[in-house]
Amino acid sequence: DEELARGLYRGPLHGIPYGLKDLFAVPGYKTTWGAEPYQHQLLPDTAKVYQRLEAAGAVLVAKLTTGALARGDVWFGGKTKNPWDLKQGASGSSAGSASATAAG
């Protein structure tokens, strides 16, 4: 809002927050693919989806968990939980995205 008030318009998604699955390379962020051998990996590449969202003015607020190598909900940090029932996993390679969306 402050930027818009100053006349700074970043694009059609200006200021819209989003989270990106931890399969996509983003400068300055680890891209772990949820797998222990890659937990410290910083890739020199930048994912096209990130570039396009950034160019449209969207704001990255989180890298979201994915199961190891995009398989299931278990990653090197544990198991991604269902925010409505912590005894359950969120399931699937989009477990982090699903949990974040369900949690609001």
Residue spans of the language-model regions?
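Gly/Ser-rich catalytic/binding loops embedded in alpha/beta enzyme cores
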Residues: 1-104
